[in-house]
Amino acid sequence: MIKIADFTLFFFIFVFSPSLPLAQSQLPDLDPQDKASLLIFRVSIHDLNRSLSTWYGSSCSNWTGLACQNPTGKVLSLTLSGLNLSSQIHPSLCKLSSLQSLDLSHNNFSGNIPSCFGSLRNLRTLNLSRNRFVGSIPATFVSLKELREVVLSENRDLGGVVPHWFGNFSMNLERVDFSFCSFVGELPESLLYLKSLKYLNLESNNMTGTLRDFQQPLVVLNLASNQFSGTLPCFYASRPSLSILNIAENSLVGGLPSCLGSLKELSHLNLSFNGFNYEISPRLMFSEKLVMLDLSHNGFSGRLPSRISETTEKLGLVLLDLSHNSFSGDIPLRITELKSLQALRLSHNLLTGDIPARIGNLTYLQVIDLSHNALTGSIPLNIVGCFQLLALMISNNNLSGEIQPELDALDSLKILDISNNHISGEIPLTLAGLKSLEIVDISSNNLSGNLNEAITKWSNLKYLSLARNKFSGTLPSWLFKFDKIQMIDYSSNRFSWFIPDDNLNSTRFKDFQTGGGEGFAEPPGKVEIKISAAVVAKDELSFSYNLLSMVGIDLSDNLLHGEIPEALFRQKNIEYLNLSYNFLEGQLPRLEKLPRLKALDLSHNSLSGQVIGNISAPPGLTLLNLSHNCFSGIITEKEGLGKFPGALAGNPELCVETPGSKCDPANIDASQEEIYQNELVEGPISIWIFCLSAFISFDFGVLGIFCSARARSYILQTKA
């Protein structure tokens, strides 16, 4: 099954079941036979929280989760959701002959779904979601003629083929939710013709086959994360009713049919992660009720559809994601008329021209991602009108000009990524006011000047990259002052003097891998943004931006002198350290002091003395480069060198002793360099290649020593 890389969409809409008969103020006594069945059930299960300790006596009012019929006392409804109950289901439940609603969701029940459930002939609602049931749908379900809702979602080992009779056994069936299970095969044809069906959710299974048109007025259709193929049907029968259509992460191909414009009630359309291509027809006019449109990760080409804004003025589009396609041309000015827009993602296309100057008219905008295009011009000053902005990502374009001091008006900003452009000038001091910043990437530009201590006001900073610019001056004493920092990349600049050790004793690069120790449970560089869509109160947009990288420091390719601060090797959570291509002196600290170290590059410096201890001591060490220094003495392969061929090349006074070659202490020469010369990947790029090999599959590429692949996902949930 195709795995979700970037965006995942979950829809939870409940179709209200018919009201059960209400008990009168004087509740009846529980039917003796039903009482006996329930007591047997209670004894058979594990009730760790003693949630069913109220099950005693004769009055229905005392029994947790029960609703009884007046005057018979027969059990009509049993709701035991979220009580942490476990064990297999005892067949005594099947003796509740009048039961109309059974909800055992959010527990730890296991085993097969009891086949005796088929004897509950009055059952209208069955919810067994979020348990550990296995096997397949019992054939006895064919007897449940009154069933209106069946929810079996999130039972990962429940599956098999959906029975061919499933759409025929109950003419009243309105809601079917088999999401996040293991169902396989094609959709049974009977489901396509079940006239009463309004909600069908089969997300995250392994279902196959082509999609055919449904013949009923569906309201919600969610077939995401399966293996459906073929082209997209028109859903003619659902034109007056279909509100949510999610077929993301399948293998659909072809163009986007113009008939989608006839779905006048459509509010959520997600066709991301498929194989759609061609241009989007200019005749296609989306529903004026559209709130969310996600066509990302396809092969669409041509110009961006401009008619979206002509039909979305009443309620307004909240999310527009057309990223990862082949759209070209300018960004249409009409997009700046989508007044309710909160997330705009047009990244990874072929867009040209300027960022629209009127983008600041989108005052509700919280996420802008225009990265990986060919946009030109400067960052429009009008963008400060997006005063609710949380993420501004415009990296990998051809933008120029300077960083506007007025950007300090975006005081809610958490993510600022303008890397890989042609932006020049200095960092405005006014940006120190952006105290919510967590990720700042301004690498690979033409920025210059000295760094000002004012940026230490970014107290929430997790990731800071100034790499590949023209910054100069001494490294500031406050370099390690950020309390929450995980990654610092100042590589390929013109910084000089010493590596400061101020604040190193108080800084503890956080342990984000296990969630234990002194760190936090969240992964490194993760920023979560939750957006409430005011236009539809039930919607919540969760935008997550991950720097899938490790904890580390990169100060390579600068003009640094002096010794490596001892305190730097006391940062026990550091995984990557790159100080190569500088003028550092002194001895190599013991690597045992960095137990989590995975990559270390100290090459092309002037480090000296003997290499003491086992250089492969950190168990996770994968890359080591100590070449082109001034180390001396004798080292054997037993001390860990065999794991890193070429790691000590270019140290003429160092002799590496192998089983076939012994060192003469009186005659150490430079022959070792020739032995390893062809095995060494030289320069700072060596550690980058390591990172690239580990993380090349991630969405946004690699950022320096930290292997910073960027992934993002956002979830638009429709809650009951």
Curated annotation (Swiss-Prot):
Q: In which tissues is it expressed?
A: Mostly expressed in apices (e.g. shoot apical meristem and flower buds), and, to a lower extent, in flowers, leaves, seedlings and siliques. Also expressed in the inner tissues of the proximal root meristem. Expressed throughout the vascular cylinder of root tips.
Q: Which residues, by range, are in coiled-coil regions?
A: none
Question: In residue terms, where are the LRR repeats?
Answer: 96-122, 124-144, 146-168, 170-194, 195-217, 219-238, 239-263, 264-287, 288-311, 314-338, 339-362, 364-386, 388-410, 411-436, 438-458, 459-482, 484-506, 547-571, 573-594, 595-617, 619-641
- Establish whether keyword Lyase is in the entry: no
The protein's UniProt keywords, in alphabetical order, are:
Cell membrane, Developmental protein, Disulfide bond, Endoplasmic reticulum, Glycoprotein, Leucine-rich repeat, Membrane, Receptor, Repeat, Signal, Transmembrane, Transmembrane helix
- Molecular-function GO terms, alphabetical: peptide receptor activity
Effect ascribed to mutating R303C: In strain: cv. Ita-0
One Pfam family hit? LRR_8
Describe what happens upon changing M207I. Answer: In strain: cv. Ita-0
Altering A374S: what's the impact?
A: In strain: cv. Bu-0, cv. Co-1, cv. El-0, cv. Gr-3, cv. Jl-3, cv. Kas-1, cv. Landsberg erecta, cv. Lu-1, cv. Pi-0
Q: How does it sit in the membrane?
A: Single-pass type I membrane protein
Query: Any ranges marked Cytoplasmic in the topology annotation, and which?
Result: 708-720
Q: Does the keyword Hydrolase apply?
A: no
Q: What happens when the gene is disrupted?
A: Insensitivity to root growth regulation by root CLE peptides (e.g. CLE8, CLE9/CLE10, CLE11, CLE13, CLE14, CLE16, CLE17, CLE18, CLE20, CLE21, CLE25, CLE26, CLE40, CLE41/CLE44 and CLE45). Impaired interaction with CRN. Stem cell proliferation leading to enlarged shoot and flower meristems, as well as alterations in the development of the gynoecia, flower pedicels, and stamens. Reduced sensitivity to CLV3, CLE19 and CLE40 peptides. Ectopic fruit organ initiation after floral meristem termination. Enhanced resistance to nematode infection.
* Consequence the record notes for mutating D157N: In strain: cv. Bu-0, cv. Co-1, cv. El-0, cv. Gr-3, cv. Jl-3, cv. Kas-1, cv. Landsberg erecta, cv. Lu-1, cv. Pi-0
Task: Identify the domain of life.
Answer: Eukaryota
SUPFAM superfamilies per UniProt = L domain-like
Q: Which PANTHER family match?
A: LRR RECEPTOR-LIKE KINASE, RECEPTOR LIKE PROTEIN 30-LIKE
Summarize the subunit comment: Parts of a tetrameric complex made of two CLV2/CRN heterodimers that can interact with CLV3 and CLE peptides. CLV2/CRN heterodimer interacts with CLV1 homodimers. Interacts with CRN; this dimer can interact with BAM3. Interacts with CLE14.
Q: What is this protein called?
A: Receptor-like protein CLAVATA2
Q: Please name the source species.
A: Arabidopsis thaliana (Mouse-ear cress)
